[in-house]
Design a protein with these regions (language model features):
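Class I S-adenosyl-L-methionine
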Residues: 1-105, 114, 274-277, 281, ...
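A contiguous loop/helix-start segment that scaffolds small-molecule binding in enzyme catalytic cores
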Residues: 2-6, 19-20, 51, 69, ...
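Class I SAM-dependent methyltransferase SAM-binding "motif I" and its flanking Rossmann-like core
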Residues: 12-13, 19, 75-145, 310-311, ...
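Conserved class I S-adenosyl-L-methionine
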Residues: 251-260
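Conserved SAM-binding loop of SAM-dependent methyltransferases across substrates and taxa
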Residues: 261-273
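Conserved S-adenosyl-L-methionine
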Residues: 270-277, 341-343
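Conserved SAM-binding loop
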Residues: 290-291
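C-terminal substrate-binding/active-site "lid" region of AdoMet-derived donor-dependent transferases
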Residues: 339-393
C-alpha cells in the first residue's frame, strides 16, 4: 500500500511548517507540488515532480513504484486547496479497483490569511473570505456586509481597491501582505483609497476592515434605490414577494426574463452571490439601466443579455429558478425551454392582465408543473397632497408560482 501525505505548506517559508509536516516530507520517497513549493527541496536526493492538478498528481502516484509520497499544497489543506479534488480522485480509484491502494494522510498548514491576521493582531473567525486565485468572485457585497474581509489575490490589488472605492468603501481600513513568511515580506496599511493605483507582488493577501457593515441581505429595496428612466420597473412590494418566493441558493443559476431596469435581478443576485443571474431584456435602454444598477450595488454576478428570451435561453446553463416578468408573447416557448433544461425548475410569473394570468395557469397545468400558489397583490400608497393624505392605488398584480416535476 502506498502512503500519501497531503501537506499544507503554509504561506511559503519552511519555517512555518509543522513538525509533523517536516517529518512526512523527510520520510517521503517522492515530492510532488508546484514549482514555487518544490524550490525549497531542489537540493534533495528525492524524486521531484511538478504537478498541480488532481489528475496529474494522481497519475504520478499511480505510475511510480515508490511507497511514500509527499504532495505539497500551498497554505492550508482545507482552505481553497486542491486537497478535496485529489482525495476524491484517490478514493475513486480505490473504489474502482476494489482494493485499498492508498493510505491517505492530510496534514494541515498555516493559511496565509491566518498568518496575516496574526501579524496585524486581528481575529478572523467571523471574517468573510474571498479567493481570486484563477476565478471570479462577487466580493463587493461581502465587504459591504461584513466587518472583516480577507482576500487571497493574484496581485490585482489596485483593481480591487478601485472597485471598493466605487462602492463607497474608500475609507475602509486595509492591510496588504506581500511575500508573507519570506525574507522580503512586506505588510502595508492605510485606507482603501490610498491603494487604488498600487502595484502589488503576485502573492498578496489583503484584509479589509469595514467599520459600518450593512445588513446581510435585503429584500424589498426602496424603489428610489434604483436608477430609473421610462422603463417599467417591478415595484418594491411585488419584488419582495417574487424574490422571497424564489429564494435562490447562494450558488443558484437564475433567469430574470423581461428584466426591465434590473431591480429584480439585483435582489436575486444579492441572494445568489456565488451563482449567476441572467438578466434577459429586449430593449437596449433596459440593458443599460440593468448595467448601471448592477454597478451601483457592486454586483458582478449579473449577466446581461440584450435579446428576446425565447431566442437565447436555450444556450444558457440550466436554471434553478426563473422569474418571468415579461415574455413578449412567447410564454409557452420560454416555459418549454426552461422545463426541458431543468424539469424541476422553480418558476414565478407576474401578470397584470387576466389573459396572462389565464395563460400562465393553463400552461403550468398542461406541462405538469405543480402550481404552488396564485395570489393577487393590490398596493395602495398614501401620498400627501397639500393638507390632505390621498390614496394612490397601483395596478393589481397577479403572482403565479410553480415548480416542475423531475
Amino acid at each position: 500500500m502506498k502512503q500519501v501525505y497531503i501537506i499544507g505548506m503554509g504561506p511559503g517559508s519552511r519555517k512555518c511548517l509543522t513538525q509533523q509536516a517536516s517529518e512526512a516530507i523527510e520520510h517521503a520517497d517522492v515530492i510532488i507540488g508546484s514549482k514555487r513549493l518544490l524550490e525549497a527541496y531542489s537540493n534533495t536526493d528525492k524524486k521531484l515532480f511538478y504537478a498541480v492538478t488532481a489528475r496529474d498528481i494522481y497519475d504520478i502516484i499511480n505510475k511510480e513504484k515508490a511507497l511514500i509520497y509527499a504532495v505539497l499544497m500551498s497554505g492550508d489543506t482545507g482552505f481553497y486547496s486542491g486537497t478535496k479534488k485529489l482525495t476524491e480522485q484517490l478514493y475513486k480509484a480505490q473504489e474502482e479497483s476494489g482494493e485499498k491502494k492508498y493510505d491517505i494522510n492530510i496534514l494541515p498548514g498555516i493559511s496565509s490569511v491566518i498568518y496575516l491576521a496574526s501579524k496585524i493582531g486581528q481575529p478572523w473567525e467571523m471574517a468573510a473570505m474571498v479567493s481570486l486565485h484563477g476565478k471570479k468572485q462577487n466580493y463587493i457585497p461581502l465587504v459591504l456586509t461584513n466587518e472583516w474581509t480577507y482576500f487571497l489575490t493574484q496581485g490585482d490589488v489596485s483593481h480591487i481597491c478601485k472597485r471598493l472605492c466605487e462602492s463607497g468603501l474608500g475609507g475602509a481600513d486595509i492591510w496588504i501582505g506581500e511575500n508573507l513568511s519570506y525574507d522580503n515580506e512586506k505588510i502595508l496599511s492605510g485606507h482603501v483609497s490610498e491603494y487604488s493605483e498600487y502595484t502589488a507582488a503576485g502573492l498578496t493577501v489583503m484584509a479589509v476592515n469595514n467599520h459600518y457593515p450593512q445588513a446581510a441581505v435585503m429584500t424589498g429595496l426602496p424603489d428610489e434605490s434604483f436608477i430609473r428612466a421610462d422603463i417599467p420597473m417591478t415595484k418594491r412590494e411585488i419584488r419582495a414577494s417574487v424574490v422571497s418566493r424564489l429564494s435562490p441558493a447562494k450558488d443558484a443559476i437564475v433567469y430574470d426574463i423581461g428584466a426591465g431596469t434590473g431591480s429584480v435581478s439585483v435582489e436575486l443576485a444579492m441572494h445568489a452571490l456565488y451563482g449567476t443571474v441572467y438578466a434577459v431584456e429586449r430593449t437596449k435602454e433596459g440593458c443599460e439601466l440593468i448595467a448601471q444598477n448592477a454597478r451601483k450595488f457592486g454586483l458582478d454576478n449579473i449577466d446581461i443579455i440584450n435579446a428576446s428570451a425565447a431566442d437565447v435561453i436555450d444556450k444558457l446553463p440550466a436554471a434553478d429558478s426563473v422569474f418571468i416578468g415579461g415574455s413578449g408573447g412567447e410564454l409557452e416557448k420560454i416555459m418549454d425551454i426552461v422545463l426541458k433544461k431543468n424539469p424541476g425548475v422553480h418558476i414565478v410569473i407576474t401578470a397584470v392582465t387576466l389573459e396572462t394570468l389565464n395563460d400562465s395557469v393553463r400552461l403550468m397545468e398542461d406541462k405538469k408543473v405543480d402550481v404552488i400558489d396564485i395570489v393577487q397583490i393590490a398596493v395602495t400608497q398614501i401620498k400627501k397632497r397639500g393638507r390632505y393624505h390621498m390614496l394612490a392605488a397601483n395596478n393589481p398584480v397577479f403572482i403565479i408560482e410553480g415548480r416542475g416535476n423531475r
